[in-house]
Amino acid sequence: MKQKVIVFSQIDQDVQKKLEQNFNVVTLQPKLGNVHEQLLEHVRDADGMIGAGRLLNRDNLAPATRLKIISSVSVGYDNYEVDYLNEKNIYLTNTPHVLTETTADLGFTLLMAAARKVAYLDHWTKQGQWHRTTREAQFGMDIFGKTLGIIGLGHIGAAVARRGFYGFNMNILYHNRHEKPELAQGLSAQYCSLKELLQRSDFVVVTVDLNAESKALIRAEQLAQMQPHAVLVNISRGPVIDEQALIEALKANQIFAAGLDVYEKEPLKESELFELDNVITLPHVGSATVATRRKMAELAYQNLVDVLEGRVPRYVVNPQVIGSSK
């Protein structure tokens, strides 16, 4: 008998086909009604789950009796109740590294677009406002040779820094819980406190993991430390920045602009951010290219197969469960 796998979000079609060939697959269908109820029904005898973006915790996993793995098609895992998975000896795996360069591309895209008012000017032009030469209201900020501050110099943060250093001759500052000489090497990156980074940087890109320490890391106090011409970009997780404090800072022109791919609550359906010309809002698409999402899905598939065939997968979020049996 084939093992049962729940697909809880849309994934690459080729990977979906492989799943259906090798497992008894149940794909949750929002069009068919309450997804929570579908999950409660099917998780009882599921051996594995694969997908991304859905909150999975003891409330919807409690009926599970055979579940061995949740294979997340993502790097972040803040939507999973890891402590509960540890209690139940359920593997949680993710897909790091394959999306590093793609996410860094988007981070630098947001930096450039916010600095040069790309979204605002696109709308301005399409609205027929280009009657004469542009004026100061349409002017942006230079990027070449400026100072780039990275909050969270992990793989993605370092990839953003490389783009700034090699492509735009930028001076690199970074703040981390600990110095990262192995990643800073070759970038002439200077380690400094968060306050100093905010005070000195022309551009600030946030790439930290979301945890108890980083939640609301950037609040009104930190925004007040930034330069009035500074641009803030967030490609990490929404709760790292106090969203209302950022809105107030943008309204008051306390900073020049912001570029956001993540938010405190997602999907973002209504927000004061939508009323502001000095912020670019994207729908959490840091890794969303055809090639990268395919690689992520393939890696997630392999993680799933490894566990269901009795092997330790390559990327385990909760190594405490290694060696447990179900």
What are these regions (language model features)?
Residues Y166-A184:
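NAD(P)-binding Rossmann-fold cofactor-contacting core
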Residues I156:
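Hydrophobic/small residue at the entry helix of a nucleotide-binding pocket
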Residues L92-T93, H229-K326:
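Rossmann-like dinucleotide-binding domain for NAD(H)/NADP(H)
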Residues M1-T93, R219:
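An N-terminal-biased, well-structured beta-alpha scaffold segment characteristic
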Residues I150-I151:
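Conserved N-terminal Rossmann-fold NAD(P)-binding element of oxidoreductases
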Residues P96-T147, A159-R163, G167, V317:
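Phosphate-binding beta-alpha-beta segment of Rossmann-like dinucleotide-binding domains, i.e.
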Residues L28-K31, V73-S74, I90-E101, L194-K195, ...:
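Short beta->alpha connector loops at strand-helix junctions that form conserved
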Residues N57-N60, H178-E272:
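Rossmann-like adenosine-cofactor binding region
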